[in-house]
């Protein structure tokens, strides 16, 4: 792990950096940045530059795939957002955006397949629709209003976003607050925003517009057509929405808990979508059952026994002045306390 930030009620309650990383270091988002692209598509539609029901050829030109014209014109921006283009993801390089790599497999909307190339081509869709480079449009519509920083850069066929960790956390807060930042409603198209964070099709219920969704009855994963009859992350809240990228680039947003957490770093597993690692992190978050001790019920709870005192990494310590520590009691409650000198 390079960085981990946990926010509750809009405030940072845990921020840690590791392995030479700091709050000034930039790192790549991998596929977690698909969610930024989804947001920008919504902004472009809101401003009248495009409609997600438009054929993608309107913005990519004719012959952007190896399909015949009838097949190609059926592919829409919506299909690119939902991974339902029908293009063959089993080609030798599924990241390749050249027309000879984009082969017909099935009709658009009939098959869900995690395919990077059609997603990557949303960048020129945005650029051609708005007449602006992706970084200029992103700065105007997202970065500047929220105080985020970052940059999209091409690496081969891949369109990769780099930012500092707090910028990733800011994006999570924006989503938590329904597209509102400090009273400024950045995305006013509530229909698009809600569609973005809900099941976009019935093939993979756990996928919105490039966002992963928890609490559904089934899910599919990259590289497979198998349907798992379970929630994506069973130990997490059902209203969790997630941005998931290769090597464990993660944003989790939980409206019911007013909670956001992000993780940047190196490879925790070999998955394009680190959902297993995401589950492991929730095992630890679920142990953080912090509660408030009210003055009026102090006497009632004063009989409980203190089990141990730990730091925020779970290491047992002795009381230290001016350092926030966790006091763990035998009734399962955990309190953060600071002993002042």
Positions of the model-derived regions?
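A short, well-structured edge-of-sheet supersecondary motif
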Residues: 1-21, 251-252, 258-262
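Active-site helix/loop module of the DD-peptidase/beta-lactamase fold
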Residues: 47-85, 132-164
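Penicillin-binding protein/beta-lactamase superfamily catalytic region
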Residues: 106, 147-255, 268-272
């Amino acid at each position: 792990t390079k960085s981990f930030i946990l926010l509750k009620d809009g405030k940072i309650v845990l921020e840690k950096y590791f392995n030479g990383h700091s709050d000034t270091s930039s790192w790549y988002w991998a596929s977690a940045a698909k969610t930024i692209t989804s947001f920008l598509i919504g902004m472009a539609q809101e401003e009248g530059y495009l409609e997600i029901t438009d054929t993608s050829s309107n913005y990519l030109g004719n012959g952007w795939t190896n399909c015949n014209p009838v097949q190609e014109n059926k592919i829409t921006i919506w299909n690119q957002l939902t991974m339902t283009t029908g293009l063959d993801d089993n080609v030798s390089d599924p990241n390749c955006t050249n027309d000879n790599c984009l082969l017909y497999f099935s009709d658009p909307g009939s098959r869900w397949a995690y395919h990077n190339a059609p997603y990557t081509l949303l960048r020129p869709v945005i650029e051609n629709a708005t007449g602006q480079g992706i970084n200029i449009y992103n700065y105007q519509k997202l970065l500047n209003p929220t105080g985020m920083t970052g940059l999209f850069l091409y690496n081969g066929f891949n369109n990769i976003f780099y930012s500092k960790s707090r910028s990733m956390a800011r994006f999570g807060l924006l989503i938590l607050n329904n597209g509102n930042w400090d009273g400024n409603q950045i995305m006013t198209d509530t229909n698009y925003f809600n569609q973005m964070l809900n099941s976009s099709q019935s093939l993979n219920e756990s996928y919105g517009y490039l966002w992963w969704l928890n609490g559904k009855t089934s899910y599919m994963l990259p590289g497979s057509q198998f349907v798992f009859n379970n929630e994506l992350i069973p130990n997490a809240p059902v209203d969790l929405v997630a941005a998931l990228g290769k090597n464990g680039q993660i944003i989790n947003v939980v409206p019911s808990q007013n909670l956001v957490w992000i993780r940047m770093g190196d490879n925790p597993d070999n998955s394009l979508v680190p959902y297993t690692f995401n589950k492991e992190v929730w095992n630890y978050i679920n142990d953080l059952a912090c509660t408030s001790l009210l003055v009026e019920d102090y006497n009632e709870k004063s009989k409980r026994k203190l089990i141990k005192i730990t730091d925020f990494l779970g290491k047992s310590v002795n009381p230290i002045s001016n350092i926030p520590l966790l006091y763990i009691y035998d009734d399962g409650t955990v309190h953060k306390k600071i002993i002042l000198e």
